[in-house]
């Protein structure tokens, strides 16, 4: 075993060698309020962004999948961070705080992503807004306009969770 598995196994063996007794494992299902509180603690967030995606890519003749959803969301946050922080982002020293939610829905609904993005105090709001729009124009799977608004409160996170917590991705 290598990497994290080795450390996890080693930690488990150490715990067992100290005669720790685990009575039973309980599967806990958190409430919506607990999940919203957890997501809110990942902030602070300054921007609420929604972007529509294509159901089918016109050139590659492929339909959107959850993997493409996630890659598109991560790519967008990465482009915005690269534009704002340049080398600091490339070397892992600075990035925007962000979470996003994938919403696919039925055949009649357009797939889209919802973002909650936090920014640093050192950055001007105009500069961040410019990079949010600029990164959107470089995206491959997007369709239509982007909707960018100031993040108001955790009500946006409640809206995130309407399709379930499994659709939320941290960046």
What kind of region is each of these model predictions?
Residues 98-121:
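Histidine-centered divalent-metal-coordination microenvironment in nucleic-acid enzymes
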Residues 66-101:
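Surface-exposed, low-hydrophobicity interaction/linker segments
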Residues 40, 90-92, 105-108:
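Short, conserved, surface-exposed binding loops centered on an aromatic residue
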Residues 43-47, 94-96, 109-113:
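Residues at beta-strand starts and edge strands
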Residues 1-3, 9-10:
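Nuclease-adjacent, charged terminal/linker segments that flank catalytic cores
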Residues 11, 15-48, 56-73, 119-171:
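Catalytic "initiation/cleavage/transfer" segments centered on a nucleophilic residue
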